[in-house]
Amino acid sequence: LSVHLWTPDYFSFRTTRDQALRFVNGQFVTIGLEVEGRPRMRAYSIASANYEEHLEFFSIKVPNGPLTSLLQHLKPGDKLLVSKKPTGTLVLRDLKPGKRLFLFATGTGLAPFMSLIHDPETYERFEKVILIHGVRWTNELAYHDYIEQDLKEHEYLGDEIRDKLIYYPTVTR
């Protein structure tokens, strides 16, 4: 279990993945923590790809939020509850065919798209994948360096990503 603070408000966190958990890239699960003996659960899109051994989530801290204010301070050894039933229709099989796939996200809405841009099928089905990520401030462009640099060097998808993924980080202030 680890937490990455992108800004004081934006953070991502990773946890080990139960090998029995199967999901389709773009889906979400319900996650949470036990608080005062009861589970406190919320739906979160999965940011990691379905072939990775960990689960990654991207969140914003909601002031006095019943769950996000706790998730931001997770430490190794803390127990994160993860539902066994992923769901959601933001998946490739539900998209109409076409030459270009446009992915528009603001803030933490980037999470399911992170999963999709790691999916080999995305690049098989579309000639171009255009990812637009809008935020208020430059420092809120979480994953920017990863998308611009590291992802293009992906061991298996690097060539496809360099050729087909177009990334437009957008800042409004």
Q: Can you annotate each of these PLM segments?
A:
Residues P66-R173:
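FNR/FR-type flavoprotein reductase catalytic core
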Residues L1-D78:
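Ferredoxin-reductase
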